[in-house]
Amino acid sequence: MPAIDLARLKKQTARLADSFDQPSVFLRELREILEFYVNRTLRSQSVAPSSVLPTYRTPVVVLRQIEKELGSLAERQPVRALGLADALWDEGWLETKLIAAFLLGRIPPQEERLLARLTAWTQAVRDPEVRAALLTTSLTRLRRETPDLFLILVKEWLHPARQRMWSNGIQALMPLISSPDFDNLPPIFEIVEPILKTSPATLQYDLQELIIVLFEASPDETTFFLQEIIKGTRNPLPSVALRRMAPKLPQELQISLREILRQANTRTR
């Protein structure tokens, strides 16, 4: 791989941005850039790649410069941005899917096809890096500018009939809960309550992460919420799941849960 000349890279990506409204031309020029900066040393390593997608092993600085050139264009031209994102997604490489996910995050939430695209792509994704990008970067403007619409989308993902989407829904909530500007936890509790009452073993890690983030945001509200979950269901799975998670939870919450679970056990005798 040639050493990265930032001046040259800026010229290459500026030229690439000129083809923003011509997906076929854009893809051709993007391939040339990715091939130019391909890290063949990493490609030839015998270790298994972390991605399940074909990849150029593009240096992060190259992808960030491409995103920098495209971000404002996507904001000003959302329809064309969505068309380009579709073409990039269909191209099927790790890098093209990551750029597509980035573009979704710059498209105004009012674009009517955005929510459908987010749902379709998150349902189909298998690569962990692309999945993470879709659940964070792609939801940036929706989460920040229209939190009510964002929560409607996540509630759809957490519908009882869409269990394959539950993990995505939980992970999508994390950045919102962690945001210092967000302090409205009751709607979050309402959305995740049915999932916690079910507590499937396959979601233990996701639920553990969720509880930690909720507790960091509001210890008292989260402790009370978990207490009501335990008191309000005859299903033993929430109690079983919380006992398994307890060693990984904050110490203060562990102490509270121990007492909550002891009281629940006493009531069932």
Q: Can you describe what each PLM-predicted range is?
A:
Residues M1-R269:
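Alpha-helical scaffold domains
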